[in-house]
Every structure is written in structure tokens, then in C-alpha cells.
Amino acid sequence: MKNRIHNFNAGPAALPLPVLEEIQAELLDFKGSGMSIMEVSHRSKWFDDVINETVERINRLMGLGDDFQVLFMQGGASTQFALVPMNLLPEGQSADYVNTGTWSTKAIKEAQAMGKTVNVAASSEDRNFCYIPKDIPLDPNAAYVHITSNNTIKGTAYTDFPDAGNVPLIADMSSDILSRPIDASKFGLIYAGAQKNMGPAGVCVAIIRKDMLERVPASLPSMFKYTTFADKNSMYNTPPCFAIYTVGLVVKWIEETIGGLEKMEARNRKKADTLYSIFDSSDFYSGTADKDSRSLMNVTFRLPSEDLEKAFVAQALENGLGGLKGHRSVGGCRASIYNPTSQEGIEALVDFMKEFEKKNG
């Protein structure tokens, strides 16, 4: 489509063009209602169908059984950092956290601020979070083990999740949910802000194993309890209808157009391999993550100088390649290549990188 750039922003991020076109086509008249999806009542059959179909597609894509429930919440993953220990870490118990970067650090600090007992079981801070720890010593009596599955700022990700035995894993999957198949049975809770890989900002998807709901203290305020959302099909109060609707279109695209998570993973690996090959064959670009910890979603890299990095980002945008500036906390460059990013976009970026190196190397 004319005037559309290749969008490598970290979040809010690219959405599939067919999804945007479907939104555009029915924006003024949703399913013959004579109203926009932003105008229909969340108590109507129109929205009932939206939320129920979205849940069903997520269940199918992730292979979730009847022992899981999909919730749509607000406040992003940052709110989950507090809600997880509030709901799922009983008094007198501790939880293991693995620290792999900025978002893990925030989750740890939030749990500690709640007065909870937190054990940092492993950390990659010793090398500036450029790797994922292995052989993590976990407490078999912990209430849960919390991980951040993909680290957007440093460009690292788990290839295999920790073996926690009978202790439930809890994962912030904001930046890699639905990017590959996973064994959901290992998890007590998966949560993800939608704005990176599932849809627009405004909704956080929480996938909770139903037995975990038994831990929720009755004394918590209603809007802070997972049970409130589970009991009311995420409609205790007015939900973020437009965001949920868009998530529904994205999971429909993954299921019907891409063909499921195995095909999505193959697509994502091809994109990442194409981009990482530049670092492995060049002295001009250097990746910041260890090879065995590289993310398929966020490719972080440096150039020989900050001046060159600024020129790279500016000239890339002039060539229709946007969002390549690294996170403000670390600098450098970053290409976020979430599910919607096309192989065509990756090839365009690689061609630009080769040309930029030729002129400036």
C-alpha cells in the first residue's frame, strides 16, 4: 500500500495489513449493526461474539485445555507485575524470579514493594543482560517461578523454559506471545500486553490455569482480582472493546492466513536468521546478545559510533524503514520483527544495511 513504511517499532508495533484493512472496511458499520465496534454495547450479542471467538481462537492456537481461562485486562504488563504477587503469592511463601533485563527487574521490584518474599534465583546482570541464564537453581517449594520470556531491550529470549518441576511457571510474554508453539501445561499464568505481538495498546491478555484462581485472596479489591475477570468473562466493567476486537482479528490472521503457530515460528526464524546473518558476516554491525540467547522478535545491534547510529536511523527512515532507534536506556539500534513483519521488510532492511556499510564502513 502506498505510503506505508516497514515498521520496526518495539511497541506499539506493526499490525498485519489485512487486519488494518478489515478494521477500515467495517469501522463505520460493524456486522450490519449500523454502529462502529467502538460504539456497540459490550453487553450486546455483537460484542459477545467478538470476545468469545477471540478466546476460542487463542485456545486453539495455543492448545489450551479446559483447565485454562483467557482473560482480557487493562493496565498492561506493568500492572501484572503487582497483580501476580498480590493474587498468587500467599503469605509465608516465597517466589523465584529470574532477572534477564529491565522488565524482569521491574517485576521483581514491584513484588518486593508489595512486601512479598522474592528470591532472585538467577540473573544475567553480571554481563549487562546479554544472555539467558541456564541451570537455574530453583526452590521446589516456591509459590511460582517468574520469567520474562523475551527481552525487548537487550534482544534476548529463552530457547527452552526452565524446568520448575511441580512449581508453576509465570511468564511475561508481552513481546513473543503467539510467535511459536509452547507447552502451556508448564505455566500457571501467561500474561502479555497486546501492543507488541497481538494488537493495539489498551488490553493485556492473561491466560491463567484455573487452579491458580484458588489462591486469590478474597480481601483484594475487585478490580485487582483475577477471579473477578474469570467469573465475569472479562466484563465485570466495560472492557477495552476495540482493542479486544483487534486482537481477535490478529489471532484470526494467524490461524487462517498464516496457518498456526508452527508456521508462524518458521516464518519468524527465517526473518531473524536473515537479519542476524548480517552481524555474523560483518565487522561494521555487532549484535548485543549472545548467539545462543538471541531473540526472534527484537534484534539489537551497534554500529562503530553513536554518530553513525544516528545517521543510520535517520537515513533508514528516509528509505521507508522506521522505528530502528534502540531503547532510550541503552542506545544503539533495534529492529523489532514481530509476527506481522514481512520477509519483504527484512530484505529491504538488509539491503539498506549493506548499502549503508558500503558507504560508511
Swiss-Prot record:
GO terms for molecular function: O-phospho-L-serine:2-oxoglutarate aminotransferase activity; pyridoxal phosphate binding. Pathway: Amino-acid biosynthesis; L-serine biosynthesis; L-serine from 3-phospho-D-glycerate: step 2/3; Cofactor biosynthesis; pyridoxine 5'-phosphate biosynthesis; pyridoxine 5'-phosphate from D-erythrose 4-phosphate: step 3/5. It is an enzyme of class 2 (transferase). L-glutamate binds at R43. Belongs to the class-V pyridoxal-phosphate-dependent aminotransferase family. SerC subfamily. PANTHER family: PHOSPHOSERINE AMINOTRANSFERASE. This is Phosphoserine aminotransferase. It comes from Desulfatibacillum aliphaticivorans. The gene is serC.
